[in-house]
């Protein structure tokens, strides 16, 4: 998967289109990413005991994963943020390196 944990991405489709955020977690098997502040959903939790004490029930707002095809990587070039696709190249030692397709720079 071309998007990794710690990358800054922009949502390109859906209810949060245009929002930017940092990738909190990546799930390559499901091809989904968890983006900070994007795709917030409300979960209804039941009160119950936990190891540290009692857990309060109620409605909790949290982020839900979104499909990786709905986000694009954001890179910085000359002080401006640029939305780009990701490609790969191999260096002299055979290591795989991610490349921003729009700027041509290594990520």
Curated annotation (Swiss-Prot):
Keyword DNA repair: no
Pfam families given in the database record: KOW, ribosomal_L24
Cellular component, GO, one term: ribosome
GO molecular function terms listed in the Swiss-Prot or TrEMBL record: rRNA binding; structural constituent of ribosome
Gene Ontology terms: biological process: translation
Cross-referenced InterPro entries: KOW, Rib_uL2_dom2, Ribosomal_uL24, Ribosomal_uL24_CS, Ribosomal_uL24_KOW, Translation_prot_SH3-like_sf
Family the entry assigns: Belongs to the universal ribosomal protein uL24 family.
Protein name, per record: Large ribosomal subunit protein uL24
Annotated organism of origin: Streptomyces avermitilis (strain ATCC 31267 / DSM 46492 / JCM 5070 / NBRC 14893 / NCIMB 12804 / NRRL 8165 / MA-4680)
Gene of this entry: rplX
């Amino acid at each position: 998967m071309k998007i990794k944990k710690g990358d800054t991405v922009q949502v390109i489709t859906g209810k949060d289109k245009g929002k930017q955020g940092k990738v909190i977690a990546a799930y390559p098997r499901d091809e989904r990413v968890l983006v900070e502040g994007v795709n917030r959903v409300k979960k209804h939790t039941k009160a119950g005991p936990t190891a540290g004490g009692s857990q309060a029930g109620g409605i909790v707002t949290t982020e839900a994963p979104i499909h990786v095809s709905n986000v694009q990587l954001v890179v910085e070039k000359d002080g401006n943020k640029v939305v780009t696709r990701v490609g790969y190249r191999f260096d002299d030692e055979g290591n795989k390196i991610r490349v921003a397709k729009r700027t041509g720079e290594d990520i």
